[in-house]
Amino acid sequence: MNEKTKELPACPVETTLTLIGDKWKVLILRDLMPGTKRFGELKKSIGTVSQKVLTAQLRDMEANGLVHREVYAEVPPRVEYSLTELGQSLKPILDAMWNWGEDYKNSVTGN
């Protein structure tokens, strides 16, 4: 058993929330689902997240195997982020959140 496995909660729902339970992580997943993005593109698409917070969230997601970070030896340096296979496996969860959010908005607005 590795160190990460020992730290995971017994409840699978809690485990999932441990990995993606932050507002920014869910939005990062949403914005990387279509494909690779550079840091600036991610920051712009997410909106109000600070550079410091986005960097910390991406590092955490990379450490947990959800995001791949590719650094290119160019001037200026180019860094791209993409979802790993594990990150892509969260698509049905994000799709369900999208559908639930649409249903909720429609029920509240009467549409």
Cite the ranges covered by each PLM segment.
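Short beta-strand His + acidic residue motifs that chelate non-heme Fe in jelly-roll/DSBH
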Residues: 70
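Amphipathic alpha-helical dimerization/coiled-coil segments
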Residues: 30, 88-111
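HhH-family (HhH-GPD) DNA N-glycosylase catalytic core used in base-excision repair
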Residues: 1-8, 105-111
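Basic, amphipathic "hinge/linker" alpha-helix immediately C-terminal to the N-terminal HTH DNA-binding motif
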Residues: 73-97
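N-terminal helix-turn-helix DNA-binding core of bacterial DNA-binding proteins
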Residues: 7-53, 77-80
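Residues within the DNA-recognition helix of helix-turn-helix
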Residues: 57
